[in-house]
Design a protein with these regions (language model features):
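Charged, solvent-exposed interaction patches on well-folded alpha/beta domains
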Residues: 1-47, 52-58, 62-264
């Protein structure tokens, strides 16, 4: 009996084709596994209780406004870079980081800009300076910061008043003793203390067009005045009384000029 290879091959192909159709049909009708979605959003704000410029609720609202709040969205559709860029537009955010983990969590980590000085200028401008001497808008934030008042434009605030503030804040004594910096029309600097009913005048700040030298120049000048003032506090006011003088002028190197309080 002669074996029919052609017929056998056709039968084999038919069987294979049929099996493929069955498998393909079964696969087509099998319910697809759902794409993983974001089950949790973790928002971590560094120094939230200390600075308080932004809250997790405000971050959520900002992302919802842009329709990019990730909760319940498919993980593959969540763009971490877009979230970072959106939050980075806030004037109170310093750095942002967003990433996804396999458990369905989207992590958002932010650092806030650190305010160091509040400016309330005579021209009506009201804003903060941060630790990089950049301007921050006014907000609901409240803190025990030194306030700078008077004839201050934004350039002078960033390039000179900021260095006065940072010098005061660098000292445990002066950051608690001085509550206000006042800039006179001729750019002379007055300091208002917390203890003692007097005004301190330290003179006009030294100026330079060299940006890299400016901070050291102002810092050295202010520290020299504060060192002399602290000695006067210790050896003068401690005996004469904290409220004897209404005005203390430490502008000049070789003398301290005091104006007695008018008791009438």
């Amino acid at each position: 009996m002669r074996f029919n290879w052609k017929k056998t091959l056709l039968i084999t192909l038919d069987v294979a084709l049929g099996a493929y159709i069955v498998v393909a049909f079964a696969s087509f009708n099998k319910p697809k596994e759902e794409a993983p979605v974001c089950k949790k959003v973790s928002i971590d704000i560094q120094d939230e209780t200390t600075n308080g410029f932004i809250t997790a609720a405000e971050i959520k609202a900002r992302l919802q406004k842009g329709n990019i709040y990730p909760l319940n969205k498919r993980m593959r559709d969540i763009n971490a870079r877009t979230i970072e860029e959106t939050l980075g537009l806030s004037p109170f955010v310093k750095t942002t980081q967003c990433y996804k983990t396999q458990d369905g969590t989207v992590h958002i980590y932010l650092t806030q800009r650190m305010p160091t000085l509040r400016i309330k200028a005579a021209n009506g401008e009201d804003y903060y300076l941060d630790d990089d001497n950049r301007i921050m808008p006014n907000s609901h934030y409240t803190s025990d910061l030194i306030i700078a008042t008077g004839h201050i434009n934004k350039w002078f605030a960033r390039n000179y008043v900021a260095h006065v503030g940072s010098t005061l804040m660098a000292s445990d004594f002066w950051k608690n003793q001085i509550v206000q910096i006042n800039v006179l029309p001729d750019y002379g600097i007055e300091l208002v203390p917390r203890v003692g009913n007097h005004i301190i005048y330290i003179g006009q700040l030294p100026q330079t067009s060299y940006v890299n030298d400016r901070k050291k120049l102002v810092t050295d000048y202010v520290n020299t005045k504060l060192d002399r003032l602290q000695k006067f506090y210790k050896y003068g006011l401690a005996q004469a009384g904290w409220n004897k003088y209404s005005y203390i002028n430490v502008e000049f190197d070789n003398q301290i000029i005091c104006k007695k309080r008018n008791l009438n």
